[in-house]
Amino acid sequence: MMRRKIFLFGDSITEESFSDGGWGASLADLLRRKADMVLRGYSGYNTRWALKVVERVFPVAEEDGGDSPAAVTVFFGANDACLPERCSGFQHVPLHEYKQNLRSIVSFLKNRWPQTAIILITPPPIDEEARLRYPYIENTTGLPERTNEVAGLYAKACIAVAEECQISVTDLWSKMQQIPNWQTECLWDGLHLSRVGNKVVFEEVAKKLKEEGIGAEDLAVDLPLIEDVDPKDPLKSFDEF
């Protein structure tokens, strides 16, 4: 049996997910020998740019569907929600276009792999004070390039698209704000995830995968475990697996 694949498609929060304590690395550990995490994270990207490159990001489907991934996570919105009149305005995507871009990405994935589970993840909350302390480009306005209120609008839009498309969604924006002192507990720079924030994403995505029948208990290992190897005839165990 070939090991299943799970694609992680998103912006920098996905690109960094294989770092120490990252949510992608934790998923890889949870499903080791059962599913491979395929990282497709692109720092700074919004849904407009993601839609532009989506055909280059994912492999062409085989005719028999045998290469279909078990799941794809789609995690965009933090950059779309940049305010258009502020220092990162070039990353901004209007809310109505954000929703349409998400629909188009979901439609692309459904057409390519009809049996693949798709999980949307909302943008995280924003700590505006920290964004002023950790700007990524010159910011002379004294105003944050993102606000938590606007991030919440994009989170709600993401949830609406998931409901419309009848797919799973993780409401990260709401979930993180349930944690005391989330601004410093879940985020290290007002946007990107701390170790605690990564743990939240990992647990929420693992929960959604389980609901889709892609949990650690649901997937088989791809070759015999050491305890399944017959000490008297080791090679026979591989023939019978």
Swiss-Prot record:
Group of enzyme by EC: hydrolase
BP GO annotations: lipid catabolic process
Swiss-Prot/TrEMBL keywords: Hydrolase, Lipid degradation, Lipid metabolism
GO MF term set: hydrolase activity, acting on ester bonds
Disulphide-bridged cysteine pairs: none
Active site residues of this protein: S12 (nucleophile), D189, H192
Taxonomy, superkingdom: Eukaryota
Coiled-coil portions: none
Xref: Pfam families: Lipase_GDSL
Assigned EC number: 3.1.1.-
Family: Belongs to the 'GDSL' lipolytic enzyme family.
Entry protein name: GDSL esterase/lipase At5g45920
